């Protein structure tokens, strides 16, 4: 199936928001390779509406029984805030080469993988209630602070496995007191949640 392309020039933009709504599905987010582009988005039909205004790139899905597959590439010279509104299903966000201001899924995250970059300072990551099969991978030099509201099942934090944890959960990595990392807040009822560091390639 053919894909239609949306793009915009980067210009002198230094920070921007990507807002996807309602309900991202089968979406890949990664770094843009063309240095003069702010972003490039490609989607199968039915096409979502894509617009740029006031420092925000908006992707608005149309209501349809058909699932729209797509990808969004973000300029690696721009600091991005990513907001997924109305849920997220099968989202692969490889932001290892993209500076991140924050990452926010308001509800219903399912089968989401987020890979993030090295950084200075602390960056918030928020995953709304009812998250399932969510994986967050950071560089080994970056710290992590995890806060889960009212319990979690099948939680893995930096190699530590927990079958079920009742009540509020707070954990932090040994690197959490150093230069920076990721402040991860997850809503109630999380299942199959993994927070890990990236493995070094062999050889």
Q: What are these model-derived regions, one by one?
A:
Residues 3-11, 29-34, 38-71, 104, ...:
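Short, surface-exposed interaction patches in beta-rich subdomains
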Residues 23:
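RNA/tRNA-interacting regions in translation and RNA-turnover enzymes
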Residues 26, 91-92:
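Short secondary-structure capping/junction motifs at helix and strand boundaries
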């Amino acid at each position: 199936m053919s894909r239609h392309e949306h793009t915009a020039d980067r210009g002198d933009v230094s920070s921007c928001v990507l807002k996807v709504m309602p309900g991202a599905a089968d979406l890949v987010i990664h770094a843009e390779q063309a240095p003069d582009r702010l972003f490039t988005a490609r989607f199968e039909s039915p096409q979502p509406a894509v617009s740029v205004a006031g420092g925000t790139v908006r992707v608005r899905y149309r209501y349809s029984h058909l699932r729209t597959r797509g990808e969004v590439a973000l300029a690696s010279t721009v600091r991005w805030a990513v907001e997924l509104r109305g849920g997220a299903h099968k989202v692969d966000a490889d932001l290892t080469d993209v500076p991140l201001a924050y990452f926010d899924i308001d509800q219903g995250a399912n089968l989401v993988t987020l890979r993030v970059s090295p950084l200075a300072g602390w960056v918030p990551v928020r995953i709304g209630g009812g998250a399932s099969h969510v994986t967050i991978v950071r560089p080994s030099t970056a710290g992590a602070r995890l806060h889960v509201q009212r319990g979690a099942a099948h939680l893995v934090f930096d190699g530590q496995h927990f079958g079920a944890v009742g009540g509020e959960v707070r954990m932090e990595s040994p690197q959490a007191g150093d230069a920076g990392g990721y402040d991860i807040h997850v809503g109630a009822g999380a299942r199959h949640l993994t927070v890990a560091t990236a493995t070094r390639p062999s050889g």
